[in-house]
């Protein structure tokens, strides 16, 4: 099977073939064309149009940057450069055919002029079966063994997946690139995209007021002077603003991506152009993922003394490969529930040898990023990937933490019928009081249209659940890790995988039933769409302050354990974002502060308070 997209000139010839067997009167009655116009559109006697397009089977594919599956599915790919060929004829300007097959315009005074020709364009591609066991890396490339560490974004050999930037199949690891300063200490998809990425970063800066405020306040002092931060997070425009803020505060940074699909290539290029050693691109393989992390850590003459992690992969890699580095590392800042869980496991086993800050459970992360960010981005991710209408659809959301609450609220507001699964009786009661029906997954799995996981756990959706799903059920994950959906169980010979668009796979059973799997079970919003910049400003500011706190803390303040961000800093982060809304805080009087037993400047709530 092949798909062709043709230009207006080629499309204009379609009605000629259909009209050749009609009399002028029949054509006039059926298409509303004048008899003169029909006669003018008829093919010349003695043969077909010499410029008529060849049969589909004979047309060669046209190479170039617009070809390929991504281009064929892009709205721009089918854009018609001129007015429709089926437009009703103008009484003053009629189309005629030259004897050589070209078009002509007849003006009212009888003058005949040749119409401008459009170049015929074809975009053609053949159906290809996805090979999930094939890696794009060259034969002989060293493999960073899976046994060394299990990634929280384990790709399950997804390197063969198509990505949005697949026009250049050469791996960035095989390219020799330098920025304008002559540095090659980076690895990105294409350094030439830096200018476009810079514009995206500048747009993000407008929605990240707290980080910009930190830059201004740090002009006279550098609280991170001497800090060498190695980071592993999603590389987006918002992350770039954070990295450049850390640089303005005096830190040196090296960065890799925590998710193989969430990197914005143009932003990574802009950071590399600015002198940041960045090792990331969209669509990394499993080997690429660990290679990028290793390039950030294993550097001659440079050793990190701070870690900023999202998912725990960077921390785990250093523990496994370079444990001696922890002698100089002052602390770890972890953003996600998956990474925090791994830190608590290390602490429980007595293997956590530095202080760690749990940003995920800070108020400003839980109550804003997890709730409001997911409430908006879940709809965006589903709409971009599936074009689905939400009204009346039955959806089950696994987990009713802050992420689950945001997803449920958004879908309910769009008219969906929402079910919730939950293990915690407190969260379960909250779901019931919010108007959602609490169920077990196997009770509704046959009837729901969408399954969304947001638990931070593993194997929440098993092969048994997947087998029982209805045809065309959409399955996706809003948690950090790709372990919530048992995707590995779907990579069996009896099931067929078809990539239908970027980050969208149809998994087809032998009886013809199919499910729609989004982002191969990885984080939906950052893999398939984007997230609100303003909310990420809150999280990024929390991360920056956590790094400052751990780096400057006197010896002995923090032991080898996992800590929450001090309440005073949570309140400070929130206060930096209030001016955006022209919000004005009420101040306590001395009498009121004394009555409540509070400092007038905060903190205003005890650590045990639940917002």
From Swiss-Prot:
Bias (Low complexity) ranges: 1-14, 36-57, 68-81, 145-164
Residue positions, PTM Phosphoserine: 107, 149, 152, 155, 158
Region listing for Disordered, in residue ranges: 1-184
Disulfide bonds: none
Matches recorded under InterPro entries: Adenosylhomocyst_ase-like_sf, Adenosylhomocysteinase-like, Ado_hCys_hydrolase_NAD-bd, NAD(P)-bd_dom_sf, S-Ado-L-homoCys_hydrolase_CS
Homology family: Belongs to the adenosylhomocysteinase family.
Function: May regulate the electrogenic sodium/bicarbonate cotransporter SLC4A4 activity and Mg(2+)-sensitivity. On the contrary of its homolog AHCYL1, does not regulate ITPR1 sensitivity to inositol 1,4,5-trisphosphate.
Protein name (Swiss-Prot/TrEMBL): Adenosylhomocysteinase 3
Organismal lineage: Eukaryota, Metazoa, Chordata, Craniata, Vertebrata
């Amino acid at each position: 099977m092949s798909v062709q997209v043709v230009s207006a000139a080629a499309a204009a010839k379609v009605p000629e073939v259909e009209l050749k067997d009609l009399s002028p009167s029949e054509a006039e009655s059926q298409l509303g064309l004048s008899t003169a116009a029909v006669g003018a559109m008829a093919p010349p006697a003695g043969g077909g149009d010499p410029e008529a397009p060849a049969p589909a089977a004979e047309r060669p594919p046209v190479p170039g940057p617009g070809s390929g599956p991504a281009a064929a599915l892009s709205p721009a790919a089918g854009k018609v450069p001129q007015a429709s060929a089926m437009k009703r004829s103008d009484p003053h300007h009629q189309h005629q055919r030259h004897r050589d097959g070209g078009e002509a315009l007849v003006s009212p005074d009888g003058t005949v002029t040749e119409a401008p020709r459009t170049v015929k364009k074809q975009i053609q591609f053949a159906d290809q079966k996805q090979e999930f066991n094939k890696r794009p890396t060259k034969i002989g490339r060293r493999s960073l063994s899976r046994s060394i560490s299990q990634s929280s974004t384990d790709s399950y050999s997804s390197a063969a997946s198509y990505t949005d930037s697949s026009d250049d199949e050469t791996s960035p690891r095989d390219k020799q690139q330098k920025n304008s300063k002559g540095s090659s200490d980076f690895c990105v998809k294409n350094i030439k995209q830096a200018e476009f990425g810079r514009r995206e970063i500048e747009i993000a800066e407008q929605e990240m007021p707290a980080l910009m405020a930190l830059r201004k306040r740090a002009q006279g002092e550098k609280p991170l002077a001497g800090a060498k931060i190695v980071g592993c997070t999603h590389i987006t425009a918002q992350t770039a603003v954070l990295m450049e803020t850390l640089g303005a505060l005096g830190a040196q940074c090296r960065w890799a991506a925590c998710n193989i699909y969430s990197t914005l290539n143009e932003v990574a290029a802009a950071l590399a152009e600015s002198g940041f050693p960045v090792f990331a691109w969209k669509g990394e393989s499993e080997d690429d993922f660990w290679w990028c992390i290793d390039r950030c850590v294993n550097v001659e003459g440079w050793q990190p003394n701070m870690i900023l992690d999202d998912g725990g992969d960077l921390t785990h890699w250093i523990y496994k490969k370079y444990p001696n580095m922890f002698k100089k590392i002052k602390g770890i800042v972890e953003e996600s529930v998956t990474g925090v869980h791994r830190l608590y496991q290390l602490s429980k086993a007595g293997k956590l040898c530095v202080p760690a800050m749990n940003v995920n459970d800070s108020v400003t992360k839980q109550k804003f990023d997890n709730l409001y960010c997911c409430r908006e981005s879940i709809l965006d991710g589903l709409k971009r990937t599936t074009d689905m209408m939400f009204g009346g659809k039955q959806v089950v959301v696994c987990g009713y933490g802050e992420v689950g609450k945001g997803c449920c609220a958004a879908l309910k507001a769009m008219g969906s019928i929402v079910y919730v699964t939950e293990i915690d009786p407190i969260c379960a009661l909250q779901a019931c009081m919010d108007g959602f029906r609490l169920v077990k997954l196997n009770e509704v799995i046959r009837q729901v249209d969408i399954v969304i996981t947001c638990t931070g756990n593993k194997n929440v959706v098993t092969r048994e659940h997947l087998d029982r799903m209805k045809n065309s059920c959409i399955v996706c994950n809003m948690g950090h890790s790709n372990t919530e959906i048992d995707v590995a169980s779907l990579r069996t010979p009896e099931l067929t995988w078809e990539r239908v668009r970027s980050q969208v796979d149809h998994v087809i059973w032998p009886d013809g039933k199919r499910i729609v799997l989004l982002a191969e079970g990885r984080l939906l919003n950052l893999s398939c769409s984007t997230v609100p910049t303003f909310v990420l400003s809150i999280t990024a500011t929390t991360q920056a302050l956590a790094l400052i706190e751990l780096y400057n803390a006197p010896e002995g303040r923090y032991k080898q354990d996992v800590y929450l961000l001090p309440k005073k800093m949570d309140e400070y982060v929130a206060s930096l974002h209030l001016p955006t809304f022209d919000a004005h805080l009420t101040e306590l009087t001395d009498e009121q502060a004394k009555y409540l037993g509070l400092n007038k400047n905060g903190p205003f709530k005890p650590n045990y308070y639940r917002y």
